[in-house]
């Protein structure tokens, strides 16, 4: 079987050459483990942060098989709770097959399409939902700004905020992305950070200030937004993609100044902080989807061999919506054909 290892840790920008595709023997599960066939791999900016040091998981170092969340099919189980043929989400790897401790897999409902298990009903949608409502405490009267608005999480943050009546302004890279989030996803406006004076344009779009900022990029974008925050505004710190590949990361120069004078609340989180509330979120988002208030946006790359390219593209802002890689055919679609 094929798998990718991190061949060499990147100094700054990640390149396809940092990975190596290997041919290895099919692994065998032991008691308490399952062997899965990976179908879809989740491609996330967090994949890059795992290479920089220990976070909420061990650091990925040279020689490690590249980890990833996945949707997978159980091929062999050494745990009575799981059976061959079941579809699961898993803390898996960039590989055709993976052996995983059963505590790191979850059974999936059979009425949700597999890509949706990684997008709206997976890491992306759940991160958007819990960040917006549980951390940011969004309410209908809020003016909400979200950076990386065309990215995996941002596309859902904006739509969820619009669904409860918020004014939503996105920040994205390029005129095409900005037009898409406004015309296809219903944002009230979007600022192209590549061709903008952010402070000026945020004032134009949000003349009365910003109640809630969902930050996916950090750096100078966060710096500009803090200037336009209302007193007692909330900043949801979800990611810092602008800093992940910088040899000298740029931090906002107005912290703690504006945080103090504006009495701002900045809070970071990871999606698993709210694991016990996932079903509540999925139920709510299913209702919004059925009501036509959310559009699912997915960016699927075909083939395990293209996983490094998909991650590099994401880090360079080339994806629109939730990025993932299809490793194997969908068994549901095969049964229907």
Regions found by a protein language model. Give the residues of each.
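Glycine-rich beta-strand-centered segment in the early N-terminal region that forms part
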Residues: 25-43, 51-94
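NAD(P)H dinucleotide-binding glycine-rich loop of Rossmann-like/cofactor-binding domains
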Residues: 66-73, 83-148, 293
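A generic alpha-to-beta junction signature in SAM-dependent methyltransferases
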Residues: 138, 206, 229-230
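Short amphipathic alpha-helix with an adjacent loop that forms part of the alpha/beta core around
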Residues: 197-208
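Mid-domain Rossmann-like dinucleotide-binding core that forms the NAD(H)/NADP(H) cofactor-binding site
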Residues: 119-196
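N-terminal Rossmann-like NAD(P) cofactor-binding module of classical short-chain dehydrogenase/reductase
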Residues: 89, 145, 191, 213-214
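Glycine-rich phosphate-binding loop and adjacent beta-alpha segment
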Residues: 182, 220-294, 327-337
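C-terminal capping/lid region of NAD(P)-dependent oxidoreductase domains
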Residues: 1-4, 293-300, 308-337
């Amino acid at each position: 079987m094929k798998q990718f290892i991190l061949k060499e840790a990147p100094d700054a920008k990640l390149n396809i050459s940092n990975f190596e595709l290997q041919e290895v023997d099919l692994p065998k599960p032991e008691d308490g483990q399952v062997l899965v066939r990976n179908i879809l791999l989740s491609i996330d900016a967090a994949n890059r942060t795992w290479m920089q040091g220990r976070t909420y998981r061990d650091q990925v170092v040279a020689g490690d098989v590249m980890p990833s969340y996945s949707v997978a099919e159980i091929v062999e189980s050494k745990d009575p709770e799981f059976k061959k043929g079941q579809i699961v989400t898993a803390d898996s790897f960039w590989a055709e097959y993976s052996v995983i401790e059963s505590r790191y897999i979850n059974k999936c409902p059979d009425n949700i399409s597999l890509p949706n298990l990684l997008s709206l009903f997976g890491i992306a949608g759940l991160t958007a939902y819990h960040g917006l409502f549980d951390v940011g405490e969004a309410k209908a009267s809020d003016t909400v700004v979200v950076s990386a608005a065309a990215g995996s999480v941002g596309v859902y943050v904006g739509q969820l905020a619009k669904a409860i009546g918020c004014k939503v302004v996105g920040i994205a890279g390029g005129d095409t992305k900005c037009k898409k989030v406004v015309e296809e996803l219903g944002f009230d406006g979007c600022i192209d950070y590549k061709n903008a004076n952010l402070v000026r344009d945020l004032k134009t779009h949000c003349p009365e200030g910003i109640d809630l900022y969902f930050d996916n990029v950090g750096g100078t974008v966060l710096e500009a937004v803090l200037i336009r925050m209302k007193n007692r505004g909330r900043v949801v710190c979800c990611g810092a993609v602008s800093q992940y590949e910088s040899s000298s990361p740029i931090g906002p120069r107005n912290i703690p100044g504006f945080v103090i004078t504006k009495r701002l609340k900045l809070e970071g989180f990871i999606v698993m902080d709210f694991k016990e509330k996932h079903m509540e979120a999925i139920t709510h988002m299913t209702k919004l989807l059925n009501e036509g208030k959310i559009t699912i946006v997915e960016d699927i790359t075909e083939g395990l061999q293209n996983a490094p390219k998909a991650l590099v593209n994401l880090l360079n802002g080339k994806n629109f919506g939730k990025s993932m890689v299809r490793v194997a055919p969908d068994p549901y679609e095969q049964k229907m054909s």
